[in-house]
A protein has these predicted regions:
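Residue(s) in the substrate-gating loop at a strand-loop-helix junction
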Residues: 137
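Active-site helix of classical SDR
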Residues: 116, 153, 161
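C-terminal helical subdomain
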Residues: 176, 195-230, 235-239
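Alpha-helical segment proximal to the catalytic Tyr-Lys
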Residues: 121, 165-170, 228
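Substrate-binding pocket helix/loop in short-chain dehydrogenase/reductase
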Residues: 92-105, 196, 200
Length: 249
């Protein structure tokens, strides 16, 4: 018998999902039959017609709470929340302004906390509970030059994942994915042209950058009954990690 994951009748919210990793995650849930809800600060022109879109700036706690309430009001339930909204431009650690640092922590840590709190509130009232998946980064578990505040926020997100998983069990499972380098439509801004992207990919044991949909595949598993005994986990999705420097010395 083939093993399949069917999300028919399930409602999944992916934050920051109009492009990049979030778009790939949302697509995989759609492929599995879920009712897909996405949010971002601005709508995208090319979203599938059957995806629901809500505009929200999740750095604002009240806006984040209102988003979750609106999704539940529109659909009657929320089964899976994927806290994907985040990111950081290169920022010099020694000269980053307080405003930049504050906004990076708001986006990469506090937004997920706000959404998770209100999602848990609703999921605890559902007979089937729910699942929360936090998209973290390998920057949380290794030095993060030029993205120090981002890495610190993601490290905090990993701790929040473990703590909330403990407190909200057994009704709600909470897991994180520490993603490595991913080939999004903006990969060239970080890694350069095709040759640069290939060179960076060659430093990974699997020889390439991840695709957004591959992070989506992990999310589909973590949100499903197949992961019913998985909570408080941090999945390293980094293609084997970056090769140690001594190998190229």
């Amino acid at each position: 018998m083939a093993v399949t994951i069917d999300y028919s009748g399930k409602v999944v919210l992916v934050t920051g999902a109009t492009k990049g990793v979030g778009r790939g995650i949302a697509q995989r849930f759609a492929d599995a039959g879920a009712t897909v809800v996405v949010c971002a600060r601005k709508p995208a022109d090319d979203l599938p017609a059957d995806w629901q879109f809500f505009a929200a700036d999740l750095r604002d706690g009240e806006a984040a709470f209102a988003l979750i309430d609106s999704v539940v009001a529109a659909n009657g339930r929320l089964d899976v929340l994927v806290n994907n909204a985040g990111g950081s431009p290169p920022v010099d650690t020694s000269t980053a302004s307080p405003r930049i640092t504050e906004r990076l922590v708001q986006l990469n840590l506090l937004a997920a906390i706000y959404c998770s709190q209100q999602a848990n509130h609703h999921m605890q009232q559902q007979a089937t509970g729910g699942a929360i998946i936090n998209i973290s980064s390998v920057c949380a578990v290794r030095p993060s030059p030029t993205t120090a505040a981002y890495g610190a926020a993601k490290a905090g997100l990993n701790n929040y994942t473990a703590t909330s998983a403990l407190e909200w069990a057994p009704k709600v499972r909470v897991n994180s994915i520490s993603a490595g380098m991913i080939r999004t439509e903006q990969a060239h801004l970080f890694y350069g042209d095709e040759a640069g992207i290939a060179a960076v990919g060659a430093t990974v044991p699997l020889g390439r950058l991840a695709l957004p949909t591959e992070i989506g595949d992990i999310c589909v598993y973590l949100g499903s009954p197949m992961a019913s005994y998985v909570t408080g986990a941090n999945v390293l999705a980094h293609g084997g990690g970056e090769s140690p420097a001594f190998l190229s010395a």
